[in-house]
């Protein structure tokens, strides 16, 4: 065995840690929701003339996910969407997540909506799911709690962080560091 092939075998056997994911959708949605999901860091919806398929992530989805659905890599976006939309979101997760070669998922649980939680992510992927607490969600929960905001924030964060592996904030990448926090 050559050194190059030994290295290739070693790399192929490595399991990955995905350090930033959200749970998968639990219910069907339309194509716009899917394409805007490919644009997650930008909170503005895609323009009507734009497509999430025309991004590096969109190209990767068609290259790697389409074959798992029995389609050729880089298939036309419409054909990909038609095949994908014929499969439930949880079933898609059970196909795509194990194929990613990830052993541990660090899940930002701060997105609202009908989204899989930690147990569902672990079950669908065959791996382990760990919570990343989004601080903005803690702030929203503290603002809705009775009593002193700072005390509520501390208590909620303490409880949520008890089993979490980390925290995160989306403030800087959504609005920059010059935002008015008053």
Residue ranges and their predicted role:
Residues 2-182:
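Metal-cofactor-binding active-site regions of metalloenzymes
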